[in-house]
């Protein structure tokens, strides 16, 4: 059984921590989509001695994807699925670079998957972490500095998906978004190991507190107050202004 992570990055400061963390819990391969980062993400990984055999980088190179990066059937059919098959990947976890799978009592990904099988899509709830009132994070990581989270799990989920079940047929409800991937009439489960009706629903309500569930996705949504303002607020303002005055294509 072989597992992989797919992640989109653009000037992610702490991609090395991300790779090392997921390698530690048993992820064997990474597909990284570099969305025109200022510094080539491959150069960052090489400088930090990350084994080049465990990842492949896809570059947007200014390409405009039909319906955007998340909804590009062409990207999945021509680049992502072939890479997954070439590397004999059985299960794919699609997350953002600030999201870390908390595996709880499971020793590694194999143990986790063995517990939940059979499934085609495992919907894992997100737990949001805050800023810890840190103005600027000068460390190389987010896991240690930011230890204050919400008390309740978010209803939103990310999915661990069986590669052979991924459906890229738009006529059958292809939904290549960062939350769920559509599967071929498959079995979808929640983190309580219960079968759920919808394979494409973006939310699953879990009533238990976060420390009473087997697994969750830790989302470090505010890596410090300065970065949050720059990336979440200023970037949106710039986009709105540039679109209004046609400053960008």
Model-identified regions with their sequence ranges:
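Short beta-strand/loop segment that forms part of the nucleotide-sugar
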Residues: 28-36, 56-60
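Catalytic-site signature of metal-activated, phosphate-bearing donor transferases
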Residues: 69-74, 103-249
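Short acidic/polar active-site loop segments enriched in Thr and Asp
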Residues: 28-29, 90, 120
């Amino acid at each position: 059984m072989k597992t992989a992570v797919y992640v989109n990055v653009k000037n992610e400061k702490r991609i090395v921590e991300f790779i090392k963390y997921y390698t530690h819990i048993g992820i064997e391969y990474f597909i990284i989509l570099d969305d025109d980062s200022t510094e080539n993400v491959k150069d960052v990984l090489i400088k930090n001695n990350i084994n080049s055999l465990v990842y492949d980088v896809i570059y947007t190179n200014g390409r405009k994807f039909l319906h955007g990066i998340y909804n590009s059937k062409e990207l999945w059919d021509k680049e992502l699925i072939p890479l997954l098959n070439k590397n004999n990947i059985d299960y794919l976890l699609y997350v953002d670079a600030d999201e870390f799978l908390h595996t709880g009592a499971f020793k590694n990904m194999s143990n986790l998957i063995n517990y939940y099988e059979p499934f085609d899509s495992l919907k894992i709830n997100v737990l949001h972490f805050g800023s810890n009132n840190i103005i600027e994070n000068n460390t190389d990581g987010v896991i240690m500095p930011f230890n204050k989270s919400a008390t309740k799990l978010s209803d939103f989920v990310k999915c661990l998906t069986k590669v052979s079940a991924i459906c890229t047929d738009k006529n059958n409800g292809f939904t290549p978004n960062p939350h769920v991937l559509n599967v071929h009439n498959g079995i979808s489960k929640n983190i309580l190991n219960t079968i759920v009706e919808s394979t494409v629903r973006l939310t699953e309500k879990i009533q238990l507190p976060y420390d009473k569930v087997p697994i969750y996705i830790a989302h470090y949504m505010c890596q410090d107050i300065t970065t949050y303002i720059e990336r979440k607020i200023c970037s949106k303002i710039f986009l709105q202004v540039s679109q209004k005055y046609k400053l960008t294509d």
